[in-house]
Amino acid sequence: MKKKYQNGFFIFGIVVLIIMVTQLDFQQVWEGLQRAGYWFFAVIILWAFLYMFNTAAWYIIIRSSEEKAPAPGNGTSNVAGSSPQCPVKFFWLYKITVSGFALNYATPGGLMGGEPYRIMELTPKIGTARASSSVILYAMTHIFSHFWFWLVAVLLYVLTRPINLPVGIMLCAVLVFCALGIWFFIVGYHKGLAFRMMKILSHIPGAKNWAKGFIDKHREQLDTIDQQIAALHKQNPRTFFMAVLLELACRILSSAEIMFCLLVLMPSVNFIDCILILAFTSLFANLLFFIPLQLGGREGGFLMSTAGLQMTASAGIFVGLIVRLRELIWVAIGLVFIKINKKSAKIAEN
């Protein structure tokens, strides 16, 4: 990636991070950290582990495209096992994954910061078309797994909690929403999603003029990316299922973060309740995707979900605070990784 683009992503992230930090009540933060004790460090370390699941899902998508497509500057296709080595290393991709999520957390609209950064970093290694298709396919898989996670949560709620009429209506609404989301992405996997997403943007006020111009200028590239997405899904369905399972496992295991927080407040915690809290909170927060770091939405989601499970309001506030601090720390780590990648690129050039 060009130096000016790396600096741009880094400066943007730093500015947003500073703004987010200034919104914190530092006395409340200090009291929360004192109360959490070593569990806070367990939460930070947990996410170092969880990001490996995200990286692994993206990595196998890239490896799958490596086996089917020609290397940059080479007209011959790579046959599985014939290429000497994948040009993308796992731990390099881990840094890019963390940095991409850091930019996504800080960007209104979610995918507007991290995905362009990932494409720009990956392009020198595997080419623009394959970098774009692998990033889009991973982003689709990441979102697709959320719908399955919410469906799992609905099933767990039905099996473990009493249901009255208002709750039943809400669960039915979530079920319909998830079914529509899964259908939309399955169609996207078979026919490609890049062109469809740009067409949707072309009908949104504020973005439609840019989207229409982009479609006119890059229609051929969008068609190529969609063809590669469809080909990757059809040629290697095992890779697709593995990537979805890795992302779904990451969603479920990330409920341990809530369990660690609640163990500070109560002697025993039901892990299924933690899954339900995370599912409702993530659904609520994702509906507010246009807010950077989903400020207020995530905390409100924790407050409502804990209250819905007959926990105290203070439990929801405490969990929301610890999760917010963890996000800020990992945003900072992601920005540091951007600078590390920049220095590594300089060394490679020399």
Question: Where do the PLM segments sit?
Answer:
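Short intracellular "coupling" helices and adjacent cytoplasmic loop segments at the cytosolic face
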Residues: V98-P116, N209-K212
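Transmembrane alpha-helix termini and helix-breaking/packing motifs in multi-pass membrane transporters
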Residues: W150-T160
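Predominantly cytoplasmic-facing regulatory/coupling regions of multi-pass membrane proteins
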Residues: M1-V98, L165-N286, F318-V319, R326-N350
